[in-house]
Amino acid sequence: MAQNPFKALNINIDKIESALTQNGVTNYSSNVKNERETHISGTYKGIDFLIKLMPSGGNTTIGRASGQNNTYFDEIALIIKENCLYSDTKNFEYTIPKFSDDDRANLFEFLSEEGITITEDNNNDPNCKHQYIMTTSNGDRVRAKIYKRGSIQFQGKYLQIASLINDFMCSILNMKEIVEQKNKEFNVDIKKETIESELHSKLPKSIDKIHEDIKKQLSCSLIMKKIDVEMEDYSTYCFSALRAIEGFIYQILNDVCNPSSSKNLGEYFTENKPKYIIREIHQETINGEIAEVLCECYTYWHENRHGLFHMKPGIADTKTINKLESIAIIDTVCQLIDGGVARLKL
């Protein structure tokens, strides 16, 4: 039996709509049925079609849908195969020499809260204590190996899970360790002092006013900004910066209303297009210039964080950005934080 030419392909699903519409498909639609199956439909050469995308293990199989007109299935599937595969770009290979059981528990809790599924895998490596597979509903997949000597190694694509792992590591490593790890991972020679100097130049009014964790998150994005490698999606460059502005919003809120840890940012803001405003229930406490700064920061955070790797049912709901766009986000975050501190005279 001939091998299915459309099985287990390394498909970037974000590219499918553009590829199909540019090749004659009209009335395009995508419908996520569940984590294992997405239906895409439309009209091609006058014939309505529906085909299935089935993600598994980080790859995707294109399949026929029973009961549908499959006259042009091979042509449509070939358009996807020829135009929507990931290129040979930088993979996520991250090793931490010392990673305690508590670190592992905290990482897994953090990833689970972000919607990542973690399952223990068969361990065939005699040097490993445990192996885990981390997955998302859109097919992103990272393998974690915990070695007997106390180190942890991650392997996968530089997508959503990798960005979340980087985000977590920024919270537990110091700046020297973060720089050393990135130098090793990307074979570069970035100096800690260079990052500190750039951070000071980006935040002349706020460097001594913002929380240390915010500075560390911004530093992580400044490090990534200096790394010149090809990636399918440069969201990972600015992910930490968006975490930083999220932290800045919480820092301001803590000064005026001391929010409980159970509250998320959405409880303070409501949409009033084209921006967000403070919910009426909080306007007595949060108003004036503080409210203006908070709403500007939240509107920008919401637009970008929710469009990148924020959890959605399918990968078609996420946005792929290039390096220049990611750098622009980093720079804008720094401007919003520094300008916000100046306006509030913190």
UniProtKB/Swiss-Prot annotation:
Keywords: Endonuclease, Hydrolase, Nuclease, Plasmid, Toxin-antitoxin system. Its EC number is 3.1.-.-. The keyword Nuclease applies. Pfam families: RnlA-toxin_DBD (PF19034), RnlA_toxin (PF15935), RnlA_toxin_N (PF19417). Coiled coil: none annotated. The keyword Magnesium does not apply. This plasmid is only found in Sakai-derived strains of E.coli O157. Toxic component of a type II toxin-antitoxin (TA) system. A stable (half-life over 20 minutes) endoribonuclease that degrades mRNA. Degradation may be translation-stimulated. Overexpression in the absence of cognate antitoxin LsoB causes retarded growth and mRNA degradation, this effect is mitigated upon coexpression with antitoxin LsoB or enterobacteria phage T4 Dmd. Degrades late enterobacteria phage T4 mRNAs, protecting the host against T4 reproduction. This is mRNA endoribonuclease LsoA.
